[in-house]
Design a protein with these regions (language model features):
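Acidic/polar-rich alpha-helix caps and helix-coil junctions
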Residues: 1-171, 190-360
Length: 360
């Protein structure tokens, strides 16, 4: 037990490799002791220990291959990198194959619905709200944090952070950036689309100009996960007040709480002044009543099967190059966004840029 900083301030730092091995041994111990499958929500099982051990090895391999600029005393070791990439891939493959896990709703994209309507949303949205996501269909959530919900004093605050005033007077503490929008690919070609252009809402052409960030048509035929994740101009979301549904509201950039008529019906627009680039989140915001902004019972994902698919592909690619097994895993993740599978000419480029694409 340490009682004062003076007891440790002059201790020399342990070598990073020694620290890494200690963490590895903890994950291995957990793997040996945990059950194959937990019967209690929020408790870890063997797949979680393997997934975290593999992730640590993937980091270690990457530092040893590509260096660690922030740590000038770290010396990369190519042989250590190759060994760690192989070990990471092995751990990830066991998670994928040995425990009967599957993607949420079998990785199917579901229906996109229609522009400016939220009655129907892609399957991806439903993985991140408690009423449907907490059931953990297929076991995709390998490790997650539970929350108590109403009356527990341990509810989740995610609606407060992600939602606006239209959802239980939430605070919209974070909003999507335009650079995220530009990562969502075309469902027709599988390629990136021309980057959207920010425009002032007062410009008379702002909502009709080609590739304008405020033109809803700029978002037609994009990765289904975009609609599941965010709102752009004229997209609808359920308004919530006093734990009750109060009807759909349209998001219109810089028109906060105004009156608009859409298809002959009057609406009050989404209320927030926090949006910077013209978007707000849909992901993690409940579309039903029953709980306040800090009273959610969301199972917050820490590591998911889709994450493991992509980490396996990265690790195996570093050792063996693009392989059919890894490409199939990547395409299973892409399918949930209704994206076409990778073709041979795009495979190498995909693996190079995987980490900056919201593929999972």
């Amino acid at each position: 037990i340490v009682y004062d900083n003076s007891e440790v301030v002059n201790l020399s730092r342990m070598p990073i490799a020694q620290i890494k091995e200690k963490i590895m041994s903890d994950f291995t111990y957990a793997f040996n002791k945990l059950p194959d499958r937990s019967e209690i929500s929020g408790r870890a099982a063997k797949p979680a220990a393997l997934a975290f051990r593999g992730k640590l090895q993937l980091y270690w391999a990457s530092w040893n291959k590509y260096g660690w600029p922030e740590l000038s005393t770290f010396t990369p070791d190519p042989e250590e990198a190759k060994k760690a990439f192989s070990a990471a891939a092995e751990d990830f493959k066991h998670v994928i194959e040995d425990y009967g896990l599957n993607l949420f709703r079998n990785g199917e994209p579901g229906d996109w619905g229609t522009m400016g309507n939220a009655e129907v949303l892609p399957n991806y949205y439903y993985m991140f709200i408690p009423s449907t996501g907490n059931a953990n269909d297929g076991g995709e959530m390998i490790f997650y944090f539970t929350h108590g919900g109403v009356g527990s004093a341990q509810g989740d605050p995610y609606m407060r952070d992600f939602g606006g005033r239209s959802q239980e007077n939430s605070q919209c503490c974070l909003t999507p950036a335009m650079r995220l929008v530009n990562r969502y690919q075309s469902t027709k070609t599988g390629d990136f689309l021309p980057e959207v252009v920010g425009m002032n809402p007062s410009d008379p052409n702002a909502r009709t100009a080609e590739n304008s960030a405020l033109n809803p048509e700029s978002y037609a035929n994009r990765d289904y996960r975009m609609k599941a994740t965010m709102l752009w101009d004229y997209e609808m979301i359920m308004s919530l007040s006093s734990q009750k549904e109060t009807g759909y509201v349209p998001f219109i950039f810089k028109n906060w709480g105004g009156k608009v008529e859409i298809d002959g019906k009057e609406y009050t627009t989404y209320r927030t002044d926090r949006s910077v680039d013209g978007y707000v989140f849909r992901k993690f915001i409940r579309n039903y009543g029953g709980a306040g902004r800090d009273e959610g019972d969301m199972n917050w994902p820490v590591i998911r099967l889709a994450d493991v698919f992509l980490m396996y592909a990265e690790a195996d690619n570093e050792v063996n190059g693009p392989q059919p097994y890894a490409i199939d895993l990547v395409n299973r993740v892409r399918h949930r966004g209704n994206l076409p599978p990778l073709t041979a000419d795009k495979t190498a480029k995909f693996f190079l840029h995987k980490l900056i694409h919201p593929s999972f």
